[in-house]
Amino acid sequence: MEKREELYRGKAKSVYKTDDADRLILLFRNDTSAFDGKRIEQLDRKGMVNNKFNAFIMQKLEEAGIPTQFDKLLGDNECLVKKLDMIPVECVVRNYAAGSLVKRLGIEEGTRLNPYTFELFLKDDAKGDPFINESHVVAFGWGTAEQLARMKELSIKVNDVLTKLFDDAGLLLVDFKLEFGVFHGEIVLGDEFSPDGCRLWDKDTRKKMDKDRFRQGLGDVIEAYEEVANRLGVPL
């Protein structure tokens, strides 16, 4: 597989073309951002940890019958993925109240949500990733009703699989965001799954083990990521 020119540079990953029109290479960088990219710092080992963490999670999801863009690891910081036609919508599943839900509704952080909630946000940093609903997605042509239904179905299945996986490792899966795209007509899970895009708390102490450590200035960000990886058995 030949790596070619950079196609896109995000806040924490770079995407490269390959000599296969259906495949891309993701490069996980050490860049760490918060507040829609307004604060960016370099954290040693972050790219490596997130790349291998993502590979581990995506393989677990594939084993559970959830289609993902992940193909294989190429090195410490790179992986090969399917080229998706991305849908510009973030799907957020919440099992406990945290983050923007607490701010929007005044709910106490850590409140158990039973059942979970499912939310949609437009993927647009310039607009602050605004909260949207299904009718917006269809009306503005970001996706179809059928695609949305499949995205929700897969998001709930991801929650079922990962809630147990993290629980077995002594962690609460507080919430997470997913992005989806289309590959040869099929809705497929894209982007990544790492502590950058979910909230994970220690089950006993409620210690935060995710990017909130960076957002809130708690320190030991990568140490927390590595502890989560070690608890799951991710080979780093």
From Swiss-Prot:
MF-aspect GO terms: ATP binding; phosphoribosylaminoimidazolesuccinocarboxamide synthase activity
Q: Which GO terms describe its biological process?
A: 'de novo' IMP biosynthetic process; cobalamin biosynthetic process
SUPFAM superfamilies attached here? SAICAR synthase-like
Q: Keywords on this record?
A: ATP-binding, Ligase, Nucleotide-binding, Purine biosynthesis
Any Gene Ontology CC annotation? cytosol
According to its UniProt record, which reaction does this protein catalyse?
Answer: 5-amino-1-(5-phospho-D-ribosyl)imidazole-4-carboxylate + L-aspartate + ATP = (2S)-2-[5-amino-1-(5-phospho-beta-D-ribosyl)imidazole-4-carboxamido]succinate + ADP + phosphate + 2 H(+)
Q: Which CDD domains does its entry note?
A: SAICAR_synt_PurC (cd01415)
Please state the pathway this protein functions in, per its UniProt record.
Answer: Purine metabolism; IMP biosynthesis via de novo pathway; 5-amino-1-(5-phospho-D-ribosyl)imidazole-4-carboxamide from 5-amino-1-(5-phospho-D-ribosyl)imidazole-4-carboxylate: step 1/2
Q: Which Pfam families does the annotation name?
A: SAICAR_synt (PF01259)
Record-listed E.C. numbers: 6.3.2.6
Task: Give the top-rank taxon of the lineage listed in the UniProt record for this protein.
Answer: Bacteria
Family, according to the entry, reads as follows: Belongs to the SAICAR synthetase family.
Name this polypeptide is given? Phosphoribosylaminoimidazole-succinocarboxamide synthase
From which source organism is this entry?
Pseudomonas syringae pv. syringae (strain B728a)
